[in-house]
Amino acid sequence: MTEQTGKRMMRIETDRLIITDFTMDMAQAVHENSLDEDNRRFVPDEVFETLEEARETIEFLISVYGTNDGPQVHPVITRQDGKNIGYVQMVPMEDGTWEIGYHIAKAYTGNGYATEAVESFLPEMAGRVGISEVYGICLKENIASVHVLKKCGFEPVFEGTGDYQGEKRKIFRSVRKI
């Protein structure tokens, strides 16, 4: 628990990563990580064009920690050098289910960081929000994300045209029991 919020802090450590709570001093890294071409292509609603947008988003994310009212988004930090390389998240959906999400900055992709983050984050967050299954949804053309989901034990439940960030797109929807 933190003295300031009374909420239990997130701290997951793997061999290479630390998943923790956001702090306001992470805004610059969040802003920079959001601007890469893959983020713009696959999750355009998570691009922060200005440092102020990143600050406002972090402030909101911190405000929903410890609740089931909003996205539970946590930074992924490298243990070796303390770099903020992305995030992992659980997001409540309108139907009451939850979705996993993740983004690793382009300079750090291809190293298994997303898989490592998802594998360590899922059991902890599932316990916190009280669920026994979680969905993974991404664009079908996002081969790297499809690969991460499959590697993390998600089973396909739908591949085809569906709603993705307000547009009809070809999606890959999968589920994992926890």
What are these regions (language model features)?
Residues 40, 49, 64-68, 159-160:
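Generic macromolecular interface patches on structured domains
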Residues 61-75:
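A short helix-loop-beta-strand connector motif used in the catalytic cores of GNAT acetyltransferases and
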Residues 38-60, 72:
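Conserved GNAT-fold acetyl-CoA-binding loop/helix
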Residues 22, 50-52, 65, 168:
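A short hydrophobic/aromatic micro-motif that marks alpha-helical segments and, especially, helix-coil
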Residues 1-41, 75-178:
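Acyl-donor (CoA/ACP) binding surface of acyl/acetyltransferases
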